[in-house]
Amino acid sequence: MFNRRQILGTAFAAGTVALTGTALSGAARAAGWRDKYPELVLGIVPAENASGVTDRYAPFVEYLSKELGTKVTLRVANDYAAVIEGQRNGSIHIAGYGPASYARAVVTDVKTEPFCTTVNSDGTIGYYSVFYVRNDSPYKTIDDLKGKNLGLVDPNSTSGNNVPRFLLNKLKIVPETYFSHVTYTGSHENAVLALQQKTVDVAANWWNSEEDSNLSRMVNKGLAKKDDFRMISKSDLIPNSPYAYLTDMPADAKAAIWKAFEEAPTKAKVAYDKLSDGKDREFKAVNASYYEPVVELIKFIDSLRKQKS
C-alpha cells in the first residue's frame, strides 16, 4: 500500500468516439436499478489514440453489457478533461481515469468514487513516469536539454504532465522557461510520435516494464521501433489508474459493476487481456484513500502554478 511519503519520494463533454455493447442477457434485465439506467456510459481518457482505445475496449464493453443486463456504451474522450466533465454532468457513469485526472475530478468536486484498479502481471499495483529521447541524440540527462523542446501529454495526465512537472520542480526547473517550447501532444502515443518526428527533443510517457509500456504497445502495433528511443529518467512508483463510478448511483448498481469487473479475468479472459495486451493480472478493489497522495500531488502542482502567476 502506498503512503504519502512513498509517492514520488517526498509528497507525492467534449467530442467522443462511441461504441455500444448490445449483447444483453435477457435474465439480467430485471427490474431495479436497470430501470433507472437503461444505458451506462463508460468514459475512457485518451492515453492512446481514439481508434486504439476503441479497439482495445470493444470486447470488454460487450462483456459488461451481457453481465450487467443493460446497454453499455464506450466513450473515448478527446481529452482528459472531457471525462471529468462527463462525470460532473452525469453523462459518464463509469470512468477509466488516470490517477491525476481522477484527483483533478476530486479537487474540483466531481462526485465520483474509485472502485478498482489493475494489478500488473508481476503483482505490483503501479507504474512510472519516464522521459524518452531519441536514441541517436546526444542527450543523457535533463541538464543536457536546456533550450530544447519538451513534449508532454495532457494537463490532466499523471505520468505525462503532473509527475514530470513535480520531478522538474525538484531540479528547480520551470518547464516554460527552461525549455524553448512545451507542447501538450494530447496522448502518450502522440508524445512518442512527436519525438519520433523530431517535433520535440524529449517526451514524457508511462512505463511499467520493458515489456509493458506505451512504447511497447506502439511497437506491437507497428507505430514505433523500440531501439529508436532511450529512457533518461524514471519516477518513483505511481498508483495504477482507477475506474470510478458516480457516487450517487444505487448501491446494488455499484455492486453489480464491481462484480462484473472482478470476474472479467475468468469470465471474459480474452476481452480482459485485450485491455492491457495481456500484461495485467486482475482488477483489485480500491477506495478514495488509496489515491489521496495523488490528490495531494495535484494540490501541490496547483500551488506551484499560483506562485508562478
Positions of PLM-derived features:
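Pocket-lining segment of extracytoplasmic ligand-binding domains
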Residues: S137, N149-P250
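C-terminal segment of N-terminal export signals and the immediately downstream linker at the start
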Residues: M1, A23-E39
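Extracytoplasmic small-molecule ligand-binding "clamshell" domains
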Residues: W33-A103
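An extracytoplasmic/periplasmic, membrane-proximal ligand-sensing/linker region
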Residues: W33-P59, I238, Y245-S309
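Hydrophobic/proline-rich hinge and linker segments of small-molecule sensing/allosteric domains
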Residues: C116-T141, A244-Y245
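Short loop->beta-strand "edge-of-pocket" segments that line small-molecule binding or catalytic clefts
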Residues: L40-A47, D144-G160
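Short helices/loops that flank or line small-molecule/ion binding pockets
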Residues: A81-A95, T108-D109, Y127, D143, ...
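N-terminal secretory signal peptides and thylakoid transit peptides that target proteins
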Residues: M1-G15
